[in-house]
Regions:
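Short amphipathic alpha-helical coupling elements at transmembrane boundaries
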Residues: 93-103, 205, 209-216, 228-243, ...
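Hydrophobic alpha-helical membrane-embedded segments
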Residues: 66-93, 185-202, 292-302
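Divalent metal-binding acidic/histidine catalytic loops
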Residues: 234, 256-267, 275, 279, ...
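C-terminal transmembrane module of eukaryotic multi-pass membrane proteins
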Residues: 195, 272-275, 279-353
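Intracellular effector-coupling site of seven-transmembrane GPCRs
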Residues: 224-258, 328, 333-335
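Helix-loop-helix junctions within predominantly alpha-helical proteins
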Residues: 1-68, 99-200, 205-229, 250, ...
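Generic structural concept
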Residues: 69-72, 134-137, 204, 231-234, ...
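Short intracellular "coupling" helices and adjacent cytoplasmic loop segments at the cytosolic face
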Residues: 81-86, 91, 103-107, 213-227, ...
Length: 353
């Protein structure tokens, strides 16, 4: 089947292509067919049965915490993909904007900009691939662990009323289904985290481009047309971060609350478990939570700091004693806008103007 223009633009944009290709395979974005339901519906049904098992196991603190971790993880995966599919037009429009801006930056004949774009693209791609690899490895640990734990156990706790889950052949069938559903579950969860990090890194590219253009003014001289272009670029970055916020704000909020609670519960569990194998697997769960938190907040904080640094660069680039009043006003506008940092927030925030 020939690719549409939208598919070609998004699948060939290096900074986002790793995650878009995963979403495209499962028909979450760009391609819209029944493939998406092969993952969302079975994984969603399994998640409901996992929450039902929490009710059954209530009172057994170790079992509840471990099963709650998986239930929350898969709930977040289903939530992410449901929002992605329901708002696919907004996500596709945002990704097309990234592809357009990326192409424009590629066409700038400036070695510094090309080097900057290449460096952050490589970083975004490595992060996306590493996240997928880490997700695949830890998911494999999830499904393999019960085989070495002794006795019959499922990778994820489930409760089906009236069904003996550990009898034959129910146990073998459910174990096989959980192993199969782990792969789409991983693909539903991991790419969204990498998408967030890649978009934040691309925001950093745009911010650093503005800083570079301001530094060049000291060498090339202040020109009204150049300052107007920088002001437009700054507004474009402000709009970009606002659009990113509109797509990920509530997902980030759910992640923050659910993973914050699960991190506390798992740290408590480390103090009461007795077997070394359980200690290792719980430590792996904690590591996965911390890695997701890192991907969200480290790059978000870097974007915030660099956006505020625009004011310092603009102030240092301007020869204030020699400038005309009209040029001073333009530089002051850039400085004033940069006083309000660009942030990816867990709550709605008004856009800078």
């Amino acid at each position: 089947m020939p690719q549409t223009a939208l598919e070609q633009h998004l699948l060939n944009c290096p900074i986002i292509s790793v995650n878009v290709r995963v979403w495209h395979f499962w028909s979450f974005l760009v391609k819209h067919d029944a493939m998406r339901y092969i993952s969302i519906i079975p994984v969603g049904a399994m998640t409901l049965l996992m929450f039902a098992d929490l009710y059954r196991a209530w009172g057994n603190i170790e079992e509840v915490i471990i099963n709650a971790y998986f239930a929350v993880l898969y709930f977040n995966a289903v939530l992410r993909c449901s929002i992605l599919v329901l708002n696919h037009d907004k996500y596709e429009k945002f990704l097309m904007n990234i592809a357009r801006i990326y192409k424009n930056l590629q066409q700038i004949e400036d070695h510094e900009i090309k080097s900057l774009l290449q460096r952050y693209t490589k970083r975004a791609r490595m992060l996306s691939i590493a996240n997928l690899g880490l997700g695949a490895f830890i998911s494999t640990c999830f499904v393999v662990y019960p085989l070495f734990a002794g006795g019959r156990g499922l990778p994820y706790g489930m409760y089906i009323p009236g069904v003996n889950l550990f009898g034959t052949p129910q146990y073998e069938i459910l174990f096989f289904l959980q192993v199969i559903l782990t792969f789409p579950g991983c693909c539903m969860y991991i790419p969204f985290t990498s998408f967030f990090a890649s978009c934040t890194l691309f925001g950093l590219v745009q911010v650093k481009n503005i800083q570079h253009q301001l530094r060049k003014l000291r060498i090339e001289g202040l020109k009204p047309s150049k300052l107007i272009e920088i002001i437009k670029d700054h507004q474009r970055v402000i709009d970009y971060v606002h659009d990113l916020n509109s797509l990920v704000t509530y997902i980030c909020l759910v992640e923050f609350l659910s993973f914050g609670m699960m991190l506390c519960a798992l740290l408590f569990l480390l103090n009461i478990i007795e077997h070394q194998a359980q200690f290792v697997i719980v430590a792996a769960y904690i590591f996965m939570i911390i890695s997701q938190i890192y991907a969200f907040y480290w790059h978000g904080n870097e974007l915030r700091e660099q956006s505020m640094a625009i004011a310092k660069v603009a102030y240092g680039a301007a020869p204030w004693l020699e400038m005309k009043p009209a040029l001073k006003k333009m530089v002051l506008l850039i400085i004033l806008r940069a006083q309000r940092p660009l942030e990816v927030c867990e709550t709605k925030k008004k856009k800078n103007r």
